[in-house]
């Protein structure tokens, strides 16, 4: 999933709701996977990428629709395709998917938050952010943000902090 918040030094403020993978979750694994399968099944990607996709994921349109609309955890199902985009991120069609996902994330979530809280500092957490860090670096430069950090796993970050507080 995806969420955006502002750390005020004591608590995390989340003024914009996460709308989930159907209505939102821009730049999440599910979002990137959804963008990929649309490109594959709508034949908007180069044939070489479509062939590579089906070699990795031999799935029919009917199976795809069943998994997305009739079975549990469709977001996790769609997120399983994000590694394909990451593995082929040097292909222009995959770069377009990635850039569109991050552009939407900034347009709908990050830029409104920056405006509300008058901040240019930004950090990212998660495996997708880590795997696509070079795209985040470029996007934050283009948006004139100060990229503070990209953390692959939140627990790794917390383990480095003093977590001796009693809860």
Where are these regions (language model features)?
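Fold-independent oxyanion-binding glycine-rich loops
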Residues: 1, 18-19, 127
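Short beta-strand scaffold segments in enzyme catalytic cores
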Residues: 1-8
